[in-house]
UniProtKB/Swiss-Prot annotation:
[4Fe-4S] cluster 2 binds at C265, C268, C282. S-adenosyl-L-methionine binds at Y43, G83, S133, M203. It is an enzyme of class 4 (lyase). Disulfide bonds: none annotated. GO terms for molecular function: 4 iron, 4 sulfur cluster binding; cyclic pyranopterin monophosphate synthase activity; GTP 3',8'-cyclase activity; GTP binding; metal ion binding; S-adenosyl-L-methionine binding. Catalyzes the cyclization of GTP to (8S)-3',8-cyclo-7,8-dihydroguanosine 5'-triphosphate. Keywords: 4Fe-4S, GTP-binding, Iron, Iron-sulfur, Lyase, Metal-binding, Molybdenum cofactor biosynthesis, Nucleotide-binding, S-adenosyl-L-methionine. It catalyses: GTP + AH2 + S-adenosyl-L-methionine = (8S)-3',8-cyclo-7,8-dihydroguanosine 5'-triphosphate + 5'-deoxyadenosine + L-methionine + A + H(+). GTP binds at R30, R79, T109, K169, R270, W271, R272. This is GTP 3',8-cyclase.
């Protein structure tokens, strides 16, 4: 059944590419496979988080159809996210299906806890770009952030993936008086295992809003601190990149994702598909359109509609939780 919005959009011509009125071409899609997670990071979700019924999840076939339609409109890259995507029961089936599509790149964002169980599947389907969350190398601090005691498991799996040739970026949410004293240890760890590390500003999203003001550290403050120890050389990045990156005098590569202090909305090329089928033009917008039960024709009109829903300037804080939208 057509939604009212779709009926309105039927009067508009459909473009063969996803380019909005600001000239931003949508070429990347974040795809959530589950809202469940085996960590409880305090900036992401409460300890007693309530998750969706799995009957509301998109099926493997639905993922394939939606992503295939977007590829025909110019989509080039997909990143599988969660929650924790490796907890999806039919993860292998979904990865194999997406791996058969004509994408330039498929990546995965994970916390690494069960990564070792899936490395063969990932390698076989050319999912070689891994973003792994790692907020601390200290077991006590890690436990305080995540409410879990599994740091050694994650480090072991990271090192296994590195030895097997996966391209790994570590994502560290830096928080004042929590883990900000560890940035040099993290840089050295990443360099030792030939991983890039990216320092993220804590964002005003959902559950993090209650902590954000007290713990926020800007990317510029971190950069100045790091420059006291290392010489840094800028690395040129694509216009729509989320991070600004540097090579360091210690031989490593670091990046900064300054979503709060230096938002990159004006060049953003990403949409997000939640596990329940809600397609969003922006991480920081509550609004989205659930396309799960739409026909292919209906979805085509939604894609055009969504181009007009992507803001050019960064919206204020949003209420939905990060794990629910594939952050």
């Amino acid at each position: 059944m057509f939604s009212f919005l779709c009926l309105v959009e039927l009067a508009l011509p459909m473009s063969k590419t996803l380019v909005d009125s600001y000239g931003r071409r949508i070429r990347k899609l974040r795809v959530s496979l589950t809202d469940q997670c085996n960590l409880r990071c305090h900036y992401c979700m409460p300890v007693d988080a309530i998750f969706l019924e799995q009957s509301s999840y998109l099926s493997c076939q639905e993922y394939g159809e939606i992503i295939g339609e977007l590829i025909a409109l110019g989509l080039e890259e997909v990143r599988l996210t969660g929650g924790e995507p490796l907890l999806r029961r039919n993860f292998t089936e979904i990865v194999r299906a997406i791996g058969q599509l004509k994408l330039k790149k498929i990546g995965l964002t994970t916390n690494g806890i069960v990564l070792d169980r899936h490395l063969d599947t990932l390698g076989e389907n050319n999912v070689l770009d891994l973003n792994v969350s790692l907020d601390s190398l200290n077991a006590k601090t890690f436990s305080e952030i995540t409410h879990r005691n599994c740091l050694n498991t994650i480090l072991r799996n990271l090192e296994l993936a590195s030895r097997q040739g996966f391209k790994i970026k570590l994502n560290t949410v830096v928080m004042r008086e929590i883990n900000d004293r560890e940035i040099f240890d993290l840089i050295e760890y990443a360099k030792r295992w030939e991983m890039e590390i990216r320092f993220l500003e804590i964002m005003r999203i959902g559950y993090a809003c209650r902590h954000q003001e007290k713990t926020f550290i800007s990317a510029q403050e971190l950069l100045a601190k790091i420059q006291q120890k290392y010489s840094l050389k800028p690395i040129q990045s694509a216009l729509d990149a989320t991070a600004f990156r540097y090579s360091t005098s210690c031989g490593g590569i670091i990046g900064f994702i300054a979503s709060e202090s230096q938002p990159f909305c004006g060049h953003c090329s990403r949409w997000r598909l939640s596990v329940d089928g809600t397609l969003r033009a922006c991480l920081l917008k509550n609004e989205g359109i659930n396309i799960r039960n739409f026909s292919s024709l209906e979805r085509q009109h939604v894609y055009q509609q969504l181009l007009g829903m992507k803001p050019y300037l960064r919206p204020p804080e949003v209420s939905h939780a990060m794990h629910q939208i594939g952050g």
